[in-house]
Structures are given as C-alpha cells and as structure tokens.
C-alpha cells in the first residue's frame, strides 16, 4: 500500500471520527442548551464556509476563484453544494425528526451500496469481494450500534424511507461528484465554496434567524466544536481522503462515525450501549482492516475516470 493511500485512509477516518464528535456536541446543544438545530446547521455551514474560503485565499490568493472561470466546473460545484452537502444534511435532519437518529443513520449508510451501483453502471467497475463484505459489515454493524439509540424496524414508514434514502443519495453525490474538482483546484477551496452554497440554501429552507439557546461558556465550546472540528476539519479531511483512496472506500470507512459518537456520548453524556452495540463496533472496525488489506493487493488498471472516483 502506497504512503499516499495510507494518508488517505487516515484522513478519511479522522474526518468520520471528528464528525461523530460533533454529533455529541449537537446533542448537547439541542438537549441541554435548547438550541434551535436548524439555526445551528445554517450557522455552522456559513461560518465554516467563510473561514475555509478565507484560509484558502490567504494561502492561494485569487486562484481560489479560478473554479468560476469554467461554466462546467461552476455547475459541478453547485451540484456538489446543493445535491451533495445540502441534500445529505437537510434530508438527514428530516429523517431524524421523523424517526430518530438510529433509523436516519442506518438509511444514510446505504450510500456505499449506491456508490458501488453507480460505479458499475457508469464505468463498468465491479466491486471487489472485500468491498462487498465491507459494505455488508458496515451496514449490519451500524444497525447493531444504533440499536442503543431506539432503533426499531417499526419506524420504517414511507416518509422516513423517502428522507432517509435521499440522505444516502446526498452522501453518495457528496463523495463522488467533487473528486475531479478536488484534483483540479484543491480540496480546501472546493469544500469552502460547497459549504457556502449549502449554507445559504439552508438559510432559505430553514429561515431560522434565532438560536433560542441558553448561552454560556459550554454553549460556545459546543459551537466551536461543531464549526471547527465537526465541519471544517471533518469535511476537508474526509474529502481529501476520498481524493486519495476513492469514493467507495471513503464511504465505507466513514462508518466509524457512529463509533465515535457512541463513545463520546457514553463518556460525556452518560449514554449507554450493550453487547450488541459492541458487536456492531467490532463489525465496523473489521471494515477498516478489510479495506487496508485490499489496498495492499496489486490494483488492476482502470480507466482514468473510474480511477478518480
């Protein structure tokens, strides 16, 4: 396995882990500080987007705006922001409201299967045995882990399936669509502009100008974690990892996010999990090992487009 791919695996895992940590902060802000979560989603995307674009501008100058010189790339950026970032977050939020985080998370983690189907139909790329096993383990492991969060198959109603599956589509688009843009313009500017696009769309959809939160030092700490670690670091790390190891492996490895959320919820908020949850963690960790072993095998030559996603 090349060093380039090792870094990609580490970055993908880092992005998923800090995203899970931000979920604990969101739970704290919503449950203990009465924060309007729609306001929080809008605020974190716009704030993180502005900070990310400013950072990219300080590093790269006006070249960060070169993506807008191409109509094709501008359209690709809009697709990434609207049908990737914004879609996966808004629909995930809707699924949580209707059925709880457990069902919403399980449905969202159908994304790796969707990516594999897309790769097969678009490029004729058949999934490896390791990828198929990893997708199954990740999905079953997530179901086991979410069993501690009130997961019940009775909650699978038509509206829940609609929003949950749309959330998975959003994750798939978010993982696949920007890869060429990331390689051309760099991860940071593309992620920053994608956040701004999705943030402004969230402002229009939610129209929530007030947080209604109880503000103290811990509210500020929670917001900092959500914006900086859970948005800026997690999005940039995950997509840089996807650029290095591909969308399928990246989406599978992102299933460590529920483990991170479960551990932090247990340590900081007193959440509990049983042996079924531990079994789910073991299954998800097994996917990391399988992906790493897959990467050690000689990779067959692929077409340029298929290899970039």
What are these regions (language model features)?
Residues 1-43, 153-180, 200, 303-309:
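Glycine-/small-residue-enriched transmembrane alpha-helix faces in small-molecule transporters
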